[in-house]
Amino acid sequence: MKIPFKQYLYGKEARDKLLAGVNKLADSVAITLGGKGRNVIFESTIFQKPEVTCDGVTIAREGNLEEPFENMGMQLIKQAAFRTNDMAGDGTTTAIVLARELVKAAFELDKGNPVTIKKALYGISLL
């Protein structure tokens, strides 16, 4: 029986990969933000045909990346979008863009110390 190989990343390399995934999703939805927001076209995973939308949660729902660590970053930000959509029914694009900025600030804060980041994000969530 062959045991599957697990890949582990840590430090700057892990942060860079996670941030790359976060940026890919945020860049995709940011252009749809506001009154002058643009449409995004993508291939639907369900119907395997092109789909056009300007809805951030639809774009987030369809987003997946092949690189596993970048995909983890994308999945983390998708959770923020889905929770916002569930609670408010709107604002997913704004939530994704703000979440990206929080992640970037957290990684810069204390060079990515996990305890400091958790405390800072928890403090922000209480506002």
Where are each of the predicted segments found?
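N-terminal glycine-/lysine-enriched basic segments
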Residues: 1-127
